[in-house]
Amino acid sequence: MERLSGKVILVWGFKRALLAILAGAIGVLALPPFGFFAAMFVSFTLLVWLLDGAAAGPDSGFLGRLWPAFTTGWLFGFGYFVAGLWWLGHALLIDADQFAWALPLAILGLPAFLAIFYGVAAVLARLLWSDGMGRIAALAFGFGLLEWLRSFLFTGFPWNAIGYGAMPIPLMMQSAHVIGVLGVTVLAVFVFAAPALLGTRQGRVPGIGLAVLIAAAHFAYGYYALNLPALPPAAGKAAPVVRIVQPAIDQEAKMDTAADRNAIFDKHLSLSVQPPVNGGKRPDIIVWPETAIPFILTDNQDALTRIADQLDDDQILITGAVRVEDMGPGVEPRYYNSVYVIDGRGQIIGASDKTHLVPFGEYVPFENILGYLGIENVVELPGGFSAAASRQLLTLPDGIKLYPLICYEIIFPNEMTPEIRQADAILNVTNDAWFGDTPGPYQHFLQARVRAVEQGLPLIRSANTGVSAYVDAHGRLISGIDFNEQGFVDSTLSGATVSRIDDSVRKTYFWLIIGIVGMIAVISRMGFISRVN
């Protein structure tokens, strides 16, 4: 290993850049649909050795000394995000005549921007760099801090945070309930980077030993949590049977204005009233995916009547739909990406609007500035939705409370409002047909499962196509429908975890972990400087 590390440290020029990109790309193999988490060990071991060799000339100024570390981290991030997000381009090819021009922005521009976070993470790590275990702690500190920033800066886009690579199965997800995905990220980077210590004799034993202890604790807590007794279904309330519908409608058909909207509506209704499989109990709650209603529901009384005709009086339909708010004479109405609750009489009895919109998909950020600069193509992207000021808990007639997250709202661990403490389950409606049968829908589903584990709540997830599923409070898949399959699954709503940890506690543990690895890095750095002097 010492010979290999020496070769990596000394590699230079084009080969060095290519190796950094390759190291980042290898890490994506740890994410869905592959789930080969061992790839992260290769990825981060190479990154440590590359940063070992990220040295500037003796005459370089302060910024000049940091530039090699930044470029190494940026190239690593570019490889990671291109390999992990290339599927975003699929959405632009659905209407290629209008949006193919934006393909390079999606598959190269966005990764180039996100890679800046990893470039800065590498700079922070290099400022605290030392030999031995200290540099492993410095890297964990840098990545942990920058993944936290990536979760909210510039509207936030925490997709594929490194911690997800350490959670391919429920056994390895349970730590997220205590320290969150960001806390897992910090510890995962330390463990993934620890094999780099095999390339040097300095700090090998304590560094590898600590990494083994962290990994052992991660697995041990997972085993412990999965064997805890479950709470009664839905906190002691009558446990309803939930039907999750996946219509698997091609995105081209949904976007075609000439498509038969009634046929789309009929498909949802037909799947909703099918008899239970194997003679099971009739569903009490039926869930349709994001924007399942192909028209403005409040303007279509006939649709509500048809829903009432198909549902029993005590059944509930929850569906994604576009909601329109009339702003008065002469003022453009506002459109919201929403979830409706409809009772068996066809009455809308509850609703919640999306609060975190997709930039350049549901709205155009800095629209006025872009228009002023003459960037017309960007300003003319589809969108036009308004963001709700707050998220509304959905309370059903039987007292069950659902916490609604529409589409990619579920990827934001730090945006759960206090109302989630009252919820019996997380409701996620989405439409991953935009991305085809690529890694995207599977990555999205993993993040949804981890939210369920973090919150200690079961997850009800309905996708137009993607992965529709019922997941228990420990992230275990109870029932599901694969990508591009049409159908439904019925599941009885289960309970939350025995002891739900509050988000504020998870955040405290995250900062405690950041502080500990930062302290290890600083102490090691001080010792390194004293030895050099």
Swiss-Prot record:
One of its GO terms (cellular component) is plasma membrane. The keyword Transmembrane helix applies. Catalyzes the phospholipid dependent N-acylation of the N-terminal cysteine of apolipoprotein, the last step in lipoprotein maturation. GO terms for biological process: lipoprotein biosynthetic process. PANTHER family: APOLIPOPROTEIN N-ACYLTRANSFERASE. The chain crosses the membrane at residues 17-37, 74-94, 105-125, 127-147, 178-198, 205-225, 509-529. Pfam families: CN_hydrolase (PF00795), LNT_N (PF20154). Residues 245-495 form the CN hydrolase domain. It is an enzyme of class 2 (transferase). Its main location: membrane. It comes from Rhizobium rhizogenes (strain K84 / ATCC BAA-868) (Agrobacterium radiobacter). HAMAP family: Lnt. Coiled coil: none annotated. Belongs to the CN hydrolase family. Apolipoprotein N-acyltransferase subfamily. GO terms for molecular function: N-acyltransferase activity. This is Apolipoprotein N-acyltransferase. Its EC number is 2.3.1.269.
